[in-house]
Amino acid sequence: MSDQDHSMDEVTAVKIEKGVGGNNGGSGNGGGAAFSQTRSSSTGSSSSSGGGGGQESQPSPLALLAATCSRIESPNENSNNSQGPSQSGGTGELDLTATQLSQGANGWQIISSSSGATPTSKEQSGNSTNGSNGSESSKNRTVSGGQYVVAATPNLQNQQVLTGLPGVMPNIQYQVIPQFQTVDGQQLQFAATGAQVQQDGSGQIQIIPGANQQIITNRGSGGNIIAAMPNLLQQAVPLQGLANNVLSGQTQYVTNVPVALNGNITLLPVNSVSAATLTPSSQAGTISSSGSQESGSQPVTSGTAISSASLVSSQASSSSFFTNANSYSTTTTTSNMGIMNFTSSGSSGTSSQGQTSQRVGGLQGSDSLNIQQNQTSGGSLQGSQQKEGEQSQQTQQQQILIQPQLVQGGQALQALQAAPLSGQTFTTQAISQETLQNLQLQAVQNSGPIIIRTPTVGPNGQVSWQTLQLQNLQVQNPQAQTITLAPMQGVSLGQTSSSNTTLTPIASAASIPAGTVTVNAAQLSSMPGLQTINLSALGTSGIQVHQLPGLPLAIANTPGDHGAQLGLHGPGGDGIHDETAGGEEGENSPDPQPQAGRRTRREACTCPYCKDSEGRGSGDPGKKKQHICHIQGCGKVYGKTSHLRAHLRWHTGERPFMCNWSYCGKRFTRSDELQRHKRTHTGEKKFACPECPKRFMRSDHLSKHIKTHQNKKGGPGVALSVGTLPLDSGAGSEGSGTATPSALITTNMVAMEAICPEGIARLANSGINVMQVTELQSINISGNGF
């Protein structure tokens, strides 16, 4: 301590007791200064020695107490009591009658109201202080170094004294246990074994780590904390030699693995893509590359699946996936734009590894992921037809796999746009479906084969993919290669040039049945693989058919069918062969479990009538094919095998069609029964009488109502129209009880039948006017019906 530290109003006062014999302070040479309460303050020598001359009379204890009180009021009153030479080896004692403890910046200080003397240490206990006039005061010195404890003395009431413990050195140890949050939510503790703490002269604490651990500390002035990004665990990433490219000047790379990843991003492995890993609302974007012949590289990323997003990093044939999701670069982006940077770079040298912990300063904010890309020869892509031998030769090329996700209203499309840079950096951002309907890709010059896979969802949720591979691309200008994908379910690849490949949707799978392609009259000649029907050839049979305005033709030619189908659609979209329109007659009852995307071949009927080959072996074209129920005691006859199978489900009690209306849950054996039941919930009456404004929910009710009009007019009439049944169609269903057509005219292309009055009602409901005649004649069907 210096004198300036104790230049205050009240300083520490130490009274040096004097003795004559010289043996009164022999025991005061301990490690610390002994603090005790003084018993004598006379001007002469101590009365305990008994040997000196010139002694004054010893005051009484009451006088001593009065003198002590007077020293508190007047500090210079008893300055003459410290006269006389002090003996060498005398013990320094502190008068703690009115002592106060004060905590300063450098420790505890003992403050007394007396200023006659100062505290002395044990090294200066033999030196005398000449205080004849009482005005001198020695320098303030610190007590010898040691740990101080607070000890309570019995003589001092409610006061505490700092007592120095001799022989104890200050040694402070700290144990630093950092806690990190792992990906699965558990706490991970790293114990710093054998860590020692040292304090240098500048007051900074240095932590010496144990074996195999590194703890970053701050040696500068001030206790700054390392500003790390939230929810990030910084790790060192081993890097290997990459392909045949040349790295830039940087030699240190860092990866930041996020614990929580915002946004709906799913990385799919290209070798195990199945329908289970794809959902209609998922956004898939995967880029894999195969370049050098190095193998055995491991994925360097790992993530955890959370409720709002999932990050799946997998390895396809020892090839790694690398993304940078939702990181904020130097450019200004909005909240709904997730920038994804894909970087591929490498060197032609041997596989060298380096571990750094350098922090990337350009990244700010959470949910960032920067990972460099290793290129291996084992990265095979699904749908790729390239052999392994070709992959080993094309070391400088890349395979780009683009999987456009199935989007719904309000969701975003992922647009990949490649900039012509040396490192082949791909940047993508989320664009709304309303602003961008297509997916455009600009390939880089000398790039590898590009594989485009378009998803298609069937009626039962099964996902099928269409693969398009483009090879040997030589891009001269940045806008030469443009690939446009339309986000439609029913997609067909058209014949276009090599520079522009366009996928054009032909029809939507929701509006047409499976296996049926709806085209206009102008598209019949341009579409390959479709059979066209020359309606003028039907003039030999005395029938003339004209296409109605605004009514396209629906042509279905499926392998296994016995005849082509020709249908006329009305303006309201309610076709003649629609399942909901004519389902009650049982003409279009589909199988209980239809296959998605394809139609199965018709199964051979096992009824007794077909087994005897009497029905199918008959050469009579006017005879209908019949199918008889083999259940004993039933014997019902049907014209279609699907009707017979639906009837057999009625026998077995199987009801695969269930109503999904709230609190209903009824099940039915046929789909037309389910459609008819749903109209009871909605109250829809789609069958209208052509002669009166009455409407009905069921077609059989309408047919009964039409009979009332026919009875008033004097008999039923017969009309001729174009039916939608194939050549093997026959009678109605079991429940309708309608009569079979009275006449059937068969041609090689279509089936013309004379229908019953309820068929007339169906045609009238669909917007087609049919003229009724009493006998079979040539009829011109036009827009106005006449």
From Swiss-Prot:
SUPFAM superfamilies: beta-beta-alpha zinc fingers (SSF57667)
PTM info: Phosphorylated on multiple serine and threonine residues. Phosphorylation is coupled to ubiquitination, sumoylation and proteolytic processing. Phosphorylation on Ser-60 enhances proteolytic cleavage. Phosphorylation on Ser-7 enhances ubiquitination and protein degradation. Hyperphosphorylation on Ser-102 in response to DNA damage has no effect on transcriptional activity. MAPK1/MAPK3-mediated phosphorylation on Thr-454 and Thr-740 enhances VEGF transcription but, represses FGF2-triggered PDGFR-alpha transcription. Also implicated in the repression of RECK by ERBB2.
Tissue expression pattern: Expressed in all tissues tested, including lung, kidney, spleen and thymus.
Position(s), cross-link Glycyl lysine isopeptide (Lys-Gly) (interchain with G-Cter in SUMO2): 15
Biased amino acid composition, Gly residues: 19-33
Chain residue ranges for the region called Transactivation domain B (Gln-rich): 262-496
Region described as Transactivation domain A (Gln-rich): 147-252
Transactivation domain C (highly charged): annotated segments: 497-611
Residues recorded with modification N-acetylserine: 2
Protein role: Transcription factor that can activate or repress transcription in response to physiological and pathological stimuli. Binds with high affinity to GC-rich motifs and regulates the expression of a large number of genes involved in a variety of processes such as cell growth, apoptosis, differentiation and immune responses. Highly regulated by post-translational modifications (phosphorylations, sumoylation, proteolytic cleavage, glycosylation and acetylation). Also binds the PDGFR-alpha G-box promoter. May have a role in modulating the cellular response to DNA damage.
Positions of region (VZV IE62-binding): 620-786
GO CC terms in record: chromatin; cytoplasm; euchromatin; nucleoplasm; nucleus; protein-DNA complex; transcription repressor complex
Assembly and oligomerization: Interacts with ATF7IP, ATF7IP2, BAHD1, POGZ, HCFC1, AATF and PHC2. Interacts with SV40 VP2/3 proteins. Interacts with SV40 major capsid protein VP1; this interaction leads to a cooperativity between the 2 proteins in DNA binding. Interacts with HLTF; the interaction may be required for basal transcriptional activity of HLTF. Interacts (deacetylated form) with EP300; the interaction enhances gene expression. Interacts with HDAC1 and JUN. Interacts with ELF1; the interaction is inhibited by glycosylation of SP1. Interaction with NFYA; the interaction is inhibited by glycosylation of SP1.
Primary localisation category: nucleus
Record Pfam families: zf-C2H2 (PF00096)
Region (Domain D): 709-786
Ranges annotated as C2H2-type zinc finger: 627-656, 657-686, 687-714
Name of the gene encoding the protein in the UniProt record: Sp1
Composition-biased stretches (Polar residues): 110-124
Family to which the UniProt record says this protein belongs: Belongs to the Sp1 C2H2-type zinc-finger protein family.
Motif 9aaTAD, chain ranges: 463-471
Compartments it resides in: Nucleus; Cytoplasm
Name this protein carries in UniProt: Transcription factor Sp1
